[in-house]
Amino acid sequence: MKLMHTSDWHIGKIVNQRHMTFDQEYILDNLVKMLEAERPDVLVVAGDIYDRGIPPVEAVELLDKVLSNILLQLGIPIIMIAGNHDSPDRLGFGSRLLRDKGLYISGPLLKDIQKVVLCDEYGPVNFYLIPYASPAVVREVFACNEVCDHDTAMKEMIRCIREKWNAEERNVVVTHGFIRGMEELEQSESEKPLSITLAVGGTDFVDVKHFDGFAYTALGHLHGPQQAGSPRVRYAGSLLKYSFSETKQEKSVTLAQIGKDGELSIECKSLLPLRNMRRIKGTLKGLLDPEVYANTNIEDYLHVTLTDEGELIEPMSKLRAVYPNILSLDIEIKERQVTESKTSAGQGYKHKSKLDLFSDFYTDMTGQMFTEEKALIVAKTISTLETDEREL
C-alpha cells in the first residue's frame, strides 16, 4: 500500500502579523497536483489541520476546496486526525456522514479508537486513528487512573488497540504528539508545547517503543521531517516554514510504501513554496545594492540582521522598498573585547582630554577601534561646542 503522509497544515496561520492563507493555498494546490501524479492509495494528515480552534472563514473555505478536489476529482481517500491546535469537535463534525465519500476524520478521542480498513492487492491495512488529547481527557475516556502524562496516556491507548488487533496484518497508527527514542529531535519555535512541563523544558515525551510491531506510525506535531527513534515512526513535518527557526528545514511530504509482509520504503517529496522564509545579514547599504539581491527572490519572507555601526534612519522602510515581505529586523550587537577593567581604564581621567575620554568610552562600549576618521569628526564636534559655549 502506498500512502502519502503530511501534517501540520496550520491553515489560517498568521506569522508576524502576516496572513499565510494565500501561501497555504499555493502549497496545497501543489499538493493536489502531486497526489494526481503519485496516485497514492490514501492521504494521511496527522493533525493540526487548522492553526486555532476557531479558524477564520477563509481557512474553512480553503480546506473545503482542497478536500473536495482530492476526494471528488482524484478519488483518493483521506485519513485525518485532530492535533493540539485543532478543535476536535469542530473538526469531527459530520465525520460519519463523510465516511461514505472516503473522508475519515477522528476529532474527539473515543474509547473505541477509530479503525479504518483499506485494502490493496495483498489484503487489508488497518489504520488506527488517535487524535491529540491531553492526559486528563485520556484518563477520563479510558477510566484509567494510571494515566498521569502523555507517555502513560499513549501506553493505555495502544494497549486497547492491541487487545483487538490482528498482529499478523499490516497495522498503521496515525497520531499527534511528542514521540521520541534515544536521539534528540529537531524542534522549532512555531510548535506550541503540549503541556506546561514541555513549555518549561520538561520531559513529557512519549516513548517510541509503544509503537513496536506496527508497520508504520504517521506522526504530526514537529515541523521538521524526521524519524522518531525508528525508521517506521516518522514526522512528515509542516508543508511551509512558520518561523525563522525553520529556515534550514527542507519541507516535504512522506511517501510510505508498505509491502505484502510489512516491508517499508520511505521517500520524501519536496514541495516548493510561493515564498521561502530566509535570514539575510549585512549593512543597510550592502543589502540595498542591486548586485546583492539580483539573484535572490526578493518576495521571500525575511528576517534581516543589520551590521551597521551608529544610528540608522528608517531602515525598515528603506529595506521594504526592495524586500516587501520583511517580517522582522534586528541590529547586530558585536561582542565587546574588554582587555582591562573599567576601573583601570578610567585611571587618570582628570588629566585626559575630552577627545581621549570619548575614545575610551567608545572603545569600551562598542569593542571597536576609535579610528582617526572618527577622531576627526568628534574633535570637530567638540571644537564647535566649546566655541558656542564661549560665545554664551
Stretch-by-stretch model annotation:
Residues 93-97, 101-199, 259:
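Conserved catalytic scaffold of divalent metal-dependent phosphoesterases
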Residues 14-16, 49-67, 82-101, 107, ...:
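Metal-dependent catalytic neighborhoods of phosphoester/phosphodiester hydrolases
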Residues 6-7, 43-48, 77-84, 104-109, ...:
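Active-site neighborhood of phospho(di)ester-bond hydrolases with catalytic His/Asp-centered motifs
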Residues 37, 42, 257-392:
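Accessory, non-catalytic peripheral segments of nucleic-acid enzymes
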Residues 113-121, 125, 130, 233-297:
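Binuclear metal-dependent phosphoesterase catalytic core
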Residues 10, 40-58, 75-89, 178-202:
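Active-site neighborhood of divalent metal-dependent phosphoester/pyrophosphate hydrolases
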Residues 185-264:
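Conserved beta-sheet core of the metallophosphoesterase superfamily
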Residues 1-68, 75, 373, 380, ...:
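N-terminal active-site segment of His-dependent metallophosphoesterases
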